[in-house]
Structure formats: structure tokens, C-alpha cells
Amino acid sequence: MKLLEQIFEIAKKEPDLIVLAEREQKFTYRQLFAAVSHISEQINERNLNQRPILIFGKNDFITLAAMLATNLRGHAYIPVDAHTPFERTEMIKSAAKPAAVLTTVELSADFEALFTDRISLELTDQILTDKLPALDFSKAVSGNDSNYIIYTSGTTGVPKGVEVSHDNLVTFTNWMNNDFMKIENNQILSQALYSFDLSIFSLYPSLTTGGTLISLSRDETTNFKLLFERLNKTVINTWISTPSFVDICLLDPSFTEKEHPQLVQFILCGEELTKKTAEKLLTAFPSANIYNTYGPTEATGAISSVKITKELLTENDRVPIGFAKPGVDLKIMDKEIIIVGDSVAKGYFENPEKTEQAFFTVDGKPAYHTGDAGSISADGMLRYQGRIDFQVKFNGFRIELQDIEANIQNLKEIEKAVVLPKTNDQHKVTALIAYLETEKTFEDRAAERAFTKELKAELSKTIMDYMMPTKFVYLKKFPLNQNGKVDRKALAQKERGDN
């Protein structure tokens, strides 16, 4: 059965069940499919080709409905968050060449010009009062059809689209449902941007089991006061987020089992879980089931998991990333973690060169080069040992350092750029340091800070805010190693000044 049909079966049985709760409004499964039906009709009226559809919006009800409606009409969806910089959105649109663009937010003039032939969606009273519609699932995505395409950081400065099939998503959803979604009337945190693959941890397992998505707005995730207020008046049973987001919430003294007795499960992914964070969370929620999971976007969500216990933390210097889920074979080749099996995505959308570099086959099965160093113990436990290339996780987001470098080097007065991660004793990336080769001279620190401010303003037009370097270091010439290459280790020792 197709995922959409599974969700629709729940809507037929319990149409008034809450599917998603925003800060000010709650929506039912009936209303979800009324909106899906309405949007799918608008898509159908366009007589589109079968290329993907770009959806520009926020983490909200209407954007979720647009994603499902797109799949209902047989299209993959490309989620792009409304706060994505214009130039980056333009690059994604240019690379994807979507059949159409759906927008669920008000647009500024430049975005209106970019999305000239868009389908503008809004939530109307008619949609919310409609009865549960009869839907035709014959054209809905299935099998190896592409379900969604998420654009991630690319080494050349141009984002690349990870193409995930319906079968990939079914495999992931079934695993999540079998292992984690056994809580009755499950209320599941939906914090990750829809354009970030961590979002599928919440979306599809919740929708296919009759759960309720507790959706946090950007205002709430970026304003601690609003965030803590919302959490303290909201019942959540299953928590899904990056470890960094947990770190933020642990700053609130009331984020404890005593104040949140219904919060019984944590599923963490998106970046390395440090021992300090794991220990703090175990102390705050001693009775909860806490899981560390691992998996790149190219392997559909996560492919391994392990329950966090005091014993596990005592026995390991770094928190292990777990045992492989069914259908996944993990291998270590030249110290690199290789993922083999039915979770591996189709490749990078219409980018055969990048696909060939990262995707291959092992014994006839799809495989992916993660770029992560790791080891597997005799009992099958996978351990993460850092990146083997220039890709890092910072605040839960996967970032290609060369993406930032390429965009900086496009700026005036900058000859070369190297971006390096700064880590703490827990191996967690705490900052991104940009080293810039430039002939620019500064009369004083004030002049340097002013130049940095201008540089950041220009850079913010082409990279996401979470990719912005924390500090900028200016050099006349980069040090070189014996091979004539930039000596990154020497650069790391040259960090100076505050910006």
C-alpha cells in the first residue's frame, strides 16, 4: 500500500483526530485531506509534465498538505524553506527545473519575480470545513518513483539534490513504526525544517500511525522565551531533534521528567551526540527511552540506532551510533563507513558526475560513500570516528566546508578561502573559522570589524544562516605544506581576533 493510502485510511477511520498542532491552531486528518484534495486539483489544472514540484514555505499545515498533494499527482516535491536566501533558492530552482512552484507564504518582490508562474496557496475556511473527500491514488508516487528531493550543501557552492524514492521512504517509515512508534495517541515533536531530512523522522511515522505532529514555528525555535513557554504548556510524548536542540532546551530548568512526565522517548539524529549531552539528558529524564541514531540524507533518514544507558556511556569514550536497521548492511572500507541496502537513495538529481562519485553497488545492491570514518565491533555496534573529508555537522546541519569557501571566494577582495571547524573536547563542532587570503589592509580593529560586517552581508545572500562562519581571520598569504598545498593545520594555529 502506498504511504498516502495508509494515511488516508487513518483519516477515514478517525477523521477528527488531530494531525498537526501549531501554536495557535490545531488541524484534523479530515482537514488535511480536504486541503490535499484542493491543492491537487490546482496542480491537475496546470497539465504539468512529471518533473518535480518545488514547494516554498514554512513548517506548517498548508505546506504539509502541499507536499502530500504533490505526491498524490505523481510528482516528487522539493521543499525549500521560506527563509532560504534568494540566490540559493535561485540556484536550486535553476538546477531542479521544476514543473511548477507552489508557495505557501507571502513573497518579497525578488521572490515574486523568481516564481512568476507560481501556484499560490492559502488556507481558507472552505478547505477547513470540507468533508473528507474521495481521492484517486492511481497516479500517486509508488515503488521507485521519486518521493522527495532535498537539496544539500555542494562542494562547488551549488546545492545538490538528494533524490529519495517512495520505496526508500517506506523502508524507513516501517522501521521507525516498528521500533519507535508504539505509544498510543502519540504526540510527536516536529521541529526540523521540512527542507532538512530530519523532518521525515516526525512526518511520516506520525502520519502513518495516527499520531499528532507538534509543530514549532521559526519564531519558537529561535526565541528561547517563546520556545520554553510553548514546551511548558504542550504535551509531547516522542521527542525528535538534533542533540544541539536538546542542549538548548536543557538550559530551561523545567525541562525535566518531573515537569514533563508524558515525554517518554527521545530520538536524536543529525549530528554527533556528545557524552555530556547524553549524560545531562539521562539525568533530566531518567525513565525515558533515549536513542542515538545515525544516517545521512543519502540513506533516507537513519540506518542505525542504539538506546542510551549509563552503562553504554561508561564503556565508551564517544557515544556509539548503533546497530544497523533491517535491510541495511554496514561495511568499513579504508576506514570509511559504507551503507549498503534498500535505504540508499537514487542519487543526486540530474547530476550524474556527483552521483557516480558517491553512489555505487556492492554485490548488486545500492551503496553509498558516507565520508564518515568509523568502525564496527564484533557484536555489530557502529562507532563514528569523525569526517574523512571536509564535510561537518554544525548545530545539526550538514555543511560542506567547500561550499562556504566557494561562495566566499566569489566576493570582491578575497583571493582564497579556507573554512575549518573548531571542536571541543567532546569532538563537537562549536564554530566555523574562515581564513581569508586578501591584500586588504586594516587601519585598526574597528576597520576590520566593519569589513567583516560587509562581507557577512554579501555572503548571507548565497549561503544559509547556519553556514555563516563564526569568525573571520585575514592573511596576506596562506601557508603551504611540502606538497605546495594550503597547510590547513598551520592555518588552524593562526586563529586570532574577534569578529
UniProtKB/Swiss-Prot annotation:
Its EC number(s): 6.2.1.54
SUPFAM superfamilies hit by this protein: Acetyl-CoA synthetase-like
Residues that bind D-alanine: D197, K485
Catalyzed reactions per annotation: holo-[D-alanyl-carrier protein] + D-alanine + ATP = D-alanyl-[D-alanyl-carrier protein] + AMP + diphosphate
Record keyword Cytoplasm present: yes
Keywords attached to this entry: ATP-binding, Cytoplasm, Ligase, Nucleotide-binding
GO MF entries: ATP binding; D-alanine [D-alanyl carrier protein] ligase activity
Classification via Pfam families: AMP-binding (PF00501), AMP-binding_C (PF13193)
Chief location category: cytoplasm
One GO CC term on file: cytoplasm
Family: Belongs to the ATP-dependent AMP-binding enzyme family. DltA subfamily.
Protein name per Swiss-Prot or TrEMBL: D-alanine--D-alanyl carrier protein ligase
Organism encoding this protein: Lactococcus lactis subsp. lactis (strain IL1403)
Source taxonomy: Bacteria, Bacillati, Bacillota, Bacilli, Lactobacillales
Gene from which this protein is expressed: dltA
